[in-house]
Structures are given as C-alpha cells and as structure tokens.
Design a protein with these regions (language model features):
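Beta-strand/loop motifs with alternating small/hydrophobic and polar/acidic residues, enriched
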Residues: 2-197, 520-522
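C-terminal globular interaction/adhesion domains in large, modular proteins
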Residues: 91-100, 105-115, 140-141, 145-381, ...
Length: 522
C-alpha cells in the first residue's frame, strides 16, 4: 500500500510540474503578444497616416479640377463654403480613427506648378507629402502634333488658303487623303520619348517608338492578313506596316487642344503692372551668352521702359520672360532695301522677312531659365544650347511662336545652300537645339527643307509641339536627318510661365514625403 501511495505522489508532482511549465509558457506567450500589439498598432497607424496625407492631396486636386482658380484660397483667404483642411483637420469618412488631413497650397506660377503640402494624422502619428500639380500640356511630350498632315504654309501647296481649309481636319473626320499630304513615321525613325497626336498616327513600315504613344483617335482598325490584329494607327501599306511600340500599343487619351495665341505670356512684360519681363517690337536678334547674359539687337524697340533689355551682355529678365511683338501700328518701321534692319535675308536668299513682324532670330548658350515668345516666328539661326545638361541642370528654355519655329536655311533661286558669316559653321550644319518648342499656328520646320545639299543631322534635346507636321528634310537628300530626344526634366519642371497658355485639367506630376511642417493645428 505504501508503494502505491508513493507512486501516486510522484505522479502528482509530475502533473504539477507540467501545469507550472504550461502556465509559464502561456504567460510568456501572453506577454509577447501584449508587447507586440503596440508595435503592430504603430505600424498600422504609420501606414495609415501616409494614406491620409495622400487623401488630402486627392481632395485638393479634386477641388482644383472643379475650380482652376482654387489656388487663391488659403487659411487666411478661405473659400465659400469653408474648407476645414486649410485651418484644421479634415476627417476622412469611415469608421472612427480613419484618419485626418490638413493641407496648404503655394502657387509657383513661374514654373506652372501648384505645390500642395498635405499632412495626414492617425492616433497622433503624422506624415507629410509634398505634391506638385500642373496641367497636362505640351511639355509632357517629345513630339506633339494636332494634325498629322503637311503644314499648308510649308511651301508645298500652290494655294495655301485652300489647303488650310481642306486640311484642318483629322483623318477620321474625313480629311482628303488625295489633296492633303499625310506625314508618316517611317522605317528608320526612332522616337526617343513620349508622343501624342490628336490625329491618327500614320506609319509606313516599321518605325520604333521608345516612349509611350497616345492618340485622341478612339476607333480601332482590323487587319485580317497573315495574322489578325487591331491597331490605332493608319498604315500607308495596310497590314504590312507594323510599328514597334516598346511600351505597348497607343493609348486613347482626351484631345489636347492647343491654345490659339501666346499673348498670356506677354502680360508678364507689363512694367506698369510691376512685371519684369522684356518686351521688344519687330525683328529682334537675341544671342544667349554662356555667362548668363544676352546680347540683344532690336532696332524698332525704343521704349525707355525696356532700355535695360537692349544691348550687349544685358541680364536675363528677372522673371525669365521675353516677348517679341509685331511693330504697333502707331510706330514707324522701314526696311533696308529688301532686308529687315537686322540684315535678313542675306543677299541671294529666297526667304522673305517682314520689317514689322515680331520675329526672333536666336542663337547662343543659355545659363538660366528663359521663355521666349513671338507674335510671329522664331528663327533658330545657329546652335542654341544649355551651358550644362543632364538631370541636375537648371538651364531651361521655352520657345513659343504664334506661327512657326524655324531652323535657318538660306538658299538661292537655284536651290543652292548659302553661307552666312554670322553662323560659326557658315552653313548651318548639324544644328543643336536644347529647348521645349511650341508652334501654335504652324509647325517646327526647316526653311527651304527641299532645297540644297543635306547638312547633317538636326539634334533636339527637349520637345516639339505643333499644329501641323513640318518637314526638316526629304528622302532626296536635302535638309537634315533627325535625332530627337526628350528632356525628362520637363515631366516635372517648366520654363517660366509657359503653362499659362494651357487650358487642360490639373494632375499630380511629382510627389515626395517630407518632414512634417511646424505650426500644424492642434
């Protein structure tokens, strides 16, 4: 009996030890779980605070898209009805503790950007986003065209007025393909940047598009040749034309309507209103100097208000804006023989220039940020480049002409290239152009593109936007070959005030998390 009792005692002790061990394990597990819960909660709140900040950005963007003057409002100048996000914390709809946001906005008008700083808050955890918002516009593209048709004023059509009337239609609207000359991307063409056309992309062969391609053409055409496929481009030879879209077939996006005039930029030269831009009358020669100055000759600009804008090594305008207007009707302007007072055209050149036209003759090396707009044409007469290039460069040039942006190419009546002693290469060989260019009424074009011997390759670092397609050469060996590359900085930065002429919805172009600002509401 005593042995049996001893065995029972040992069993009891063993059971008690197991219970103790299990209890200790349960306590340890519970303690671990209790310690982990605050960490897990903090992680959730940390992520939720960033989402709340993003909700603030989305909220402001929505309001801005409904009212593009919304940037005028702030904590001290509130809208009606009031927006609590300016002065306090806006609750995100949903369960309790879904989060709150507070924001402020700054209008960086010279850069075409509205900068929104949005802070999200969840259970005391705060995180902040700074977002740049700007309109969709021509700066988003290496190549943007309204009509994929030869410019009626290119010199090809015998009756430019009739051509303008008949060719101011998109392909799907029934533009005459027998009368209007369609310009196609061909085998050997490589587009190294984003492209958009309001028209239908026209191809002949196998061009390569290395950037995203978009079109406002909403239809799709079917092909039932060796393989069945649909596409949103027009093949000159039908099914055998197969362009290479490296980022995928063209997407359909809304029509991007180009403004009809650049006069909004001219307002930045109004000295009576306190603006600091430079305004010139009639033909004006601008040479950009690598030290950050410019040399300007403008014979018909006589206003004392702009005396500091003319001469040798003058400073770039403080706000970075130059506007060249036609000579006002109240002012006299005369030619020197067949030339304007700048010596254009040179002797024997078949190109004509007006004595009263707001034409810019441009060359040089830019250090700084500058926008040059003209009431008539901008003529690039020699290399026009930045003093530094690359992602870190702050040099940026916008060229916006009401009519053409032209590359200077003088020829005589026999179609022979002419030399101009003012150009460092005499004849303008292998032009280098660093700029975002917009030809509102016409196109980016080489003068006399179908005359003279070929002069090498034209290199563009920036972007080209135009109403019609403008030729730079021909397959017969005239003009130039093309080497166009997109300046990726244009995705988030802008030459001064160029976006003033846009009339498209705002979008977020860039955002980053930043330190929480001081002075946040309690």
């Amino acid at each position: 009996m005593r042995n049996r009792n001893g065995q029972q005692g040992v069993a009891m002790i063993t059971v008690m030890m197991i219970v103790v061990v299990l209890s200790l394990l349960m306590v340890a597990s519970l303690n671990y779980a209790m310690q982990g819960e605050p960490s897990s909660r903090r992680d959730q709140d940390w992520n939720a605070a960033l989402a709340a900040a993003q909700a603030g950005v989305d909220d402001y963007l929505y309001r801005l898209q409904q009212d593009d003057e919304y940037v005028q409002y702030s904590a001290t100048s509130p809208p009606t009805p009031a927006n609590v996000a300016f002065t306090g914390w806006h609750n995100i709809p949903g369960p309790a503790n879904s989060g709150q946001f507070h924001y402020s906005a700054t209008d960086l008008a010279s850069q075409g950007i509205i900068q929104v700083t949005s802070t999200g808050r969840v259970r005391g955890v705060q995180r902040t986003i700074r977002a740049s918002m700007r309109r969709r516009g021509f700066l988003d593209y290496l190549y943007l065209t309204d009509y994929e048709s030869l410019d009626p004023q290119s010199g090809y059509y015998s009756d430019p007025t009739t051509a303008t009337s008949r060719c101011s239609e998109y392909w799907w609207q029934g533009r005459s393909t027998s009368y209007c000359v369609r310009i196609s991307f061909v085998t050997g063409d490589t587009i190294n940047g984003p492209l958009h056309t309001n028209d239908t992309i026209s191809v002949n062969g196998n061009p390569t598009f290395n950037g995203a391609a978009t079109t406002a053409y909403t239809g799709a055409m079917s092909c039932t040749a060796s393989s069945s496929f649909t596409w949103r481009w027009y093949g000159l030879s039908g099914c055998s034309d197969r362009p290479v879209f490296q980022t995928g077939d063209p997407e359909v996006v809304p029509l991007l309507t180009l403004p009809t005039t650049n006069t909004a930029i001219k307002t930045e030269t109004d000295r009576a209103a306190g603006k600091t831009g430079c305004l010139y009358n009639g033909p004006t020669r601008i040479v950009l100097n690598s030290g950050g100055t410019m040399t300007v000759t403008s014979p018909v600009t006589t206003s004392s208000a702009y005396a500091s804008c003319v001469g040798t090594n003058v400073a770039l305008p403080a706000n970075g804006v130059i506007y060249v207007q036609n000579v006002p009707s109240t002012q006299t302007a005369t030619c020197t023989g067949s030339q304007n007072r700048l010596g254009y055209p040179i002797s024997g050149d078949v190109t004509s220039y007006g004595c009263r036209d707001g034409d810019v003759f441009l060359s040089g090396t830019l250090r700084g940020r500058l926008t040059i707009a003209s009431e008539n044409n901008i003529v690039i007469v020699a290399n026009t480049t930045y003093s530094s290039t690359g992602a870190a460069s702050t040099d940026m040039l916008g060229l916006i002409a009401n009519q053409f942006v032209q590359v200077y190419h003088p020829v005589n009546s026999s179609g022979t290239n002419l030399s101009d002693s003012r150009n460092p290469t005499s004849t303008f060989t292998n032009p280098q152009i660093h700029a975002a260019m917009l030809a509102l009424g016409h196109s980016f074009i080489v003068q006399n593109y179908n005359e003279g011997a070929q002069l090498g390759t034209i290199t563009v670092n920036g972007g080209i936007a135009q109403k019609w397609r403008g030729p730079v050469g021909t397959s017969g060996g005239t003009g130039y070959l093309k080497n166009y590359g997109y300046d990726a900085r244009l995705q988030y930065a802008s030459p001064p005030y160029v976006m003033d002429i846009a009339d498209t919805p705002y979008r977020v172009s860039q955002w980053a998390e930043v330190q929480n600002p001081t002075g946040l509401p309690a």
